[in-house]
Amino acid sequence: MNQGKTENRIPFVTKPVSRIFFGTAIDPLLAGQDQDELLDAVIESGINTLDMARNYQKAETVVGRWMKKRGCRDQLVLLSKCGHPTAFGRKRVSERDIREDYEKTAEALGTSYIDIYLLHRDDPDVPVGEIVELFNAMHQEGKIGAFGGSNWTYQRISEANAYAKAHDLIPFSVSSPNFGLAEQVEDLWGGGCVSISGPEQAEARAWYRKENMPIVAYSSLGRGLFSGRVTYQERDKASKVMDKFAMKGYACPQNFERLRRCEILAEKKGVSVSQIALRWIFTQDLNTYAVIGTGNPSRMTQNLNAQSIPMTKEEAEYLNLEREELP
């Protein structure tokens, strides 16, 4: 089995990209609290890519202050997202909103260039050609490198890239859906969240394999389900660890059974549950990058080490309920 792609390059990103992205949507950063030691530890661990968004409260500002103090902008790959709907549900997939978000992000980060820029949501009522043209213009202006969509269906991405090819333009080269061992049984936040996890999304995953499209997988550990703080034995207490959105999307019998199997395999291999669940992601013959948000530097190192844990095809199938017993 292919144990995960090793060529960590994304088209139109000038630097190599770490397979693990540091997710900045964690409480201290959202609240605007300086986290210099944590961010230092992220870089020292080998992670060079930060996953951000304009609507992650004060996280971009915290990262910007830290980068200025450390003078480390050129060492990093910065991903940010734009165009998130308002709290009242107004869609924001328009040139005005996208450019406004970009300028605010650039100011918060203290940079004039975002390596990877994604639309946080899609609006199918907006012709995809308009979006491709806008992102190409921003690329030509030197504002962004690679671009793409978060929570975009593969059909819309395919349509966007067909338009780009027909008009000799740069295509979408990154997609950020939910992907992980836990299947998402319900849209966590509403407003068009897209997952490619679970048996019903096999066709989507087949498209990603065929296209070798880089996947930046969010909620890749089920928003706490595979953190090690939830156990199968005490699954009825999961809500003490997982927030209401995670419970809505991931707390179901089939995912708790996946957790049980992760616990069995983790004990067998002498590693953590989160390492097993993360390692599974990289066995799926997809060009996957996993977003992991944690305030614990040692857990971050564990996550990086997960990539080297041996896992057979049969073990991966067992974890995903595709076979009943371990060989």
Regions found by a protein language model. Name each.
Residues G23-Q33, P85-R96, D125:
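Active-site mouth loops of central-metabolism enzymes
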Residues N48-R54, L118-L119, G145-S150:
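Short catalytic-loop micro-motif centered on adjacent basic/acidic residues
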Residues A59-T61, D125-I131:
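Active-site-adjacent beta->alpha loops and helix N-cap segments on the catalytic face
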Residues V128-P327:
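Beta/alpha (TIM)-barrel catalytic core signal, keyed to glycine-rich beta->alpha loops juxtaposed to Asp/Glu
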Residues L30-V42, V93-L109, S158-A162:
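Short, acidic/polar
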Residues M1-V77, Q140:
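N-terminal binding-site loop/beta-alpha segment at the start of enzyme catalytic domains
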Residues D74-A87, V174-F179:
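A short, structured active-site edge motif that brings together acidic residues
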Residues A106-P127:
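Active-site groove signature of glycoside hydrolases
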